[in-house]
Amino acid sequence: MTTIKTSNLGFPRIGLNREWKKALEAYWKGSTDKDTFLKQIDELFLSAVKTQIDQQIDVVPVSDFTQYDHVLDTAVSFNWIPKRFRHLTDATDTYFAIARGIKDAVSSEMTKWFNTNYHYIVPEYDESIEFRLTRNKQLEDYRRIKQEYGVETKPVIVGPYTFVTLAKGYEPSEAKAIQKRLVPLYVQLLKELEEEGVKWVQIDEPALVTASSEDVRGAKELFESITSELSSLNVLLQTYFDSVDAYEELISYPVQGIGLDFVHDKGRNLEQLKTHGFPTDKVLAAGVIDGRNIWKADLEERLDAVLDILSIAKVDELWIQPSSSLLHVPVAKHPDEHLEKDLLNGLSYAKEKLAELTALKEGLVSGKAAISEEIQQAKADIQALKQFATGANSEQKKELEQLTDKDFKRPIPFEERLALQNESLGLPLLPTTTIGSFPQSAEVRSARQKWRKAEWSDEQYQNFINAETKRWIDIQEELELDVLVHGEFERTDMVEYFGEKLAGFAFTKYAWVQSYGSRCVRPPVIYGDVEFIEPMTVKDTVYAQSLTSKHVKGMLTGPVTILNWSFPRNDISRKEIAFQIGLALRKEVKALEDAGIQIIQVDEPALREGLPLKTRDWDEYLTWAAEAFRLTTSSVKNETQIHTHMCYSNFEDIVDTINDLDADVITIEHSRSHGGFLDYLKNHPYLKGLGLGVYDIHSPRVPSTEEMYNIIVDALAVCPTDRFWVNPDCGLKTRQQEETVAALKNMVEAAKQARAQQTQLV
């Protein structure tokens, strides 16, 4: 008979009330000392594990918890430290310097964790790295929980194939050699766990879902080298986010268990299971509860799915678990959450997903009748949610059906539009601008809280927003920026703001998830059809424009980013949701243009993150993503300039799609890529308007004029001068005013110097 256990891959770090964020930021500001900070982090770690124990999870992970990022943890443990930080002597200072930068050294690059909204710190390889195990965090965490709670846990570490695949600074042909150099470190780390009596370790290898058959075979050799040195420690090879194509090779790995995602695999893992079976002597860790979305599971449907898996895989032991780490969903339903009852009851966060696993285990062990009450409650909650969502339906479907090809394209080509826009806008060569947001001071946050608590009237709050907007319009004019922004002081988050103002969205107060470092976001919940209600940005943008003779950009978040940064409904396709959002935003774009705004920016920073992991699935997504953007923007006059912005992406993968957006100007986060995108542009020119970020806004460091001038000069070597823009990487909301003004002053001066040089060349 098959033994059934519940397992988890990872749990949110941030705490129910973002205590983790607050502890980090207090330490960075110097308002708490290191001992206090480490104690706070330890308490949060213990609390996260205790929650999983209390939910009766049989196999609880450790070392998924981190002070910043689990990939950075792995790098630092292996002494994988960039040269510019090796002079630092304190381990904690070094760790945070890599993530955040210091005065004389820029931070390491940050990019998306596969196709999620989580960002990891990219390890930087160079041949001078002296690999050694400097810390066994897995052992420390295992001991800490054993001491505190007396329970066995499952240490987690990023595997050698995935870790090196996610790194940069080496040629592709060098990857295998670097992976092999890491093998002795993995062996040392795992043997120390084995000597401690650890029973299971989880080695995460999500990169195997995108690996070629050759690479899966190569990774198998790594595991053969590692596990041949072990005797009693069981290794779980964990994959997630999709299926593994080289399945037959995967199930032959010399490990004691294999984790597969049966939620986001498009049914492929189950088909592989049916075709090739599964080793009966290995544990099958089946991801059957969605680790990335927030909707309550249909327990009967999920139970039947697990029984289907069991009927095929005659394994001695089955672990049921989330499809991925629960890092990507909120911690738990907050007792003070304000959502409508039928909506709230239809949601399931990390803690609730663990309860679903426990119920499924009971159904598997004792039979479906044993959880009949839970099954019926889940069905009732799902049906109530469906009825609630139906009540919010709109006329969108009819409008979408009436769209024609002309609704998805501008009337004339870019080159013709450019001439008209140059004449209409009257901008200088190498125009300077910012991406949208300016620092949200304590005063801004306090004003928003007073308004939300009804301590301030709408009029009081609007007067404050207007005053802050005017102050920053004046600052921008003093800095001599060419195209201004209103600063977005009325917005807490670029997606949240629109989620609150469009029909079909619900907005939470406490459903926070980690985006990067201490930054947490509350993704809107798309539960029904999305519909435009009334203008959302026109009033604030028009007010800002009234204060200056320079152009002020209208600022919107694009349909694909709103989709990808929300928790979308799961009863219709993502394409249909994106088109609904695009149609709603199209009306906002038209309202801005009708109000006299001549430059409108529609940000799509998350376009790439929505890519399916397998390249064979890309075309379908990229086609409808570009169509959704053009649906948003194509109704404007030829003289109206459409901008878009992207960040944290491997742009090389989507350059054709960027072109298909048909935006007049795209601004791109660039400084943390350390010139990588410029190298690409040398051989793949981009001929529309382009602004490559000249400084990193994620760091408090103020770059010099010379540094930014050099970046501009390097860019102009491969980019057309007459359509190049100068801008920071991203929005400046999280920065302080002093450093923002100083950096922008240097940026404008760098642009002036580059402009003068180009004028002399002409």
UniProtKB/Swiss-Prot annotation:
PANTHER family registered for this protein in UniProt: 5-METHYLTETRAHYDROPTEROYLTRIGLUTAMATE--HOMOCYSTEINE METHYLTRANSFERASE (PTHR30519)
* A single MF term (Gene Ontology): 5-methyltetrahydropteroyltriglutamate-homocysteine S-methyltransferase activity
The UniProt function text for this chain reads:
Catalyzes the transfer of a methyl group from 5-methyltetrahydrofolate to homocysteine resulting in methionine formation.
Residues modified to S-bacillithiol cysteine disulfide = 719
Q: Which residues bind Zn(2+)?
A: 645, 647, 669, 730
Listed name of the protein: 5-methyltetrahydropteroyltriglutamate--homocysteine methyltransferase
Keyword line: Amino-acid biosynthesis, Metal-binding, Methionine biosynthesis, Methyltransferase, Repeat, Transferase, Zinc
Q: Does the keyword NAD apply?
A: no
The EC number of this protein is: 2.1.1.14
Where do the coiled-coil regions begin and end?
none
What induces its synthesis? Answer: By superoxide.
Q: Quote the record's binding site residues for 5-methyltetrahydropteroyltri-L-glutamate.
A: 18-21, 112, 519-520, 565, 609
Recall the taxonomic lineage recorded for the source organism: Bacteria, Bacillati, Bacillota, Bacilli, Bacillales
- What cofactor is needed? Zn(2+)
The record's family statement is: Belongs to the vitamin-B12 independent methionine synthase family.
Protein residues bound to L-homocysteine: 435-437, 488, 603
Which residues make up the binding site for L-methionine? 435-437, 488, 603
Q: Does the keyword Manganese apply?
A: no
Listed pathway(s): Amino-acid biosynthesis; L-methionine biosynthesis via de novo pathway; L-methionine from L-homocysteine (MetE route): step 1/1
How many cofactor units bind, and how? Binds 1 zinc ion per subunit.
Q: Where is the active site?
A: 698
Name the chemical reaction catalysed here. 5-methyltetrahydropteroyltri-L-glutamate + L-homocysteine = tetrahydropteroyltri-L-glutamate + L-methionine
Modification comment? In response to oxidative stress, Cys-719 can react with bacillithiol (BSH) to form mixed disulfides. S-bacillithiolation leads to loss of catalytic activity and methionine auxotrophy.
Q: Which GO terms describe its biological process?
A: methionine biosynthetic process; methylation
InterPro entries per UniProt: Cbl-indep_Met_Synth_N, Cobalamin-indep_Met_synthase, Met_Synth_C/arc, UROD/MetE-like_sf
**Which organism is the protein's source?**
Bacillus subtilis (strain 168)
Identify the Pfam families for this entry. Answer: Meth_synt_1, Meth_synt_2
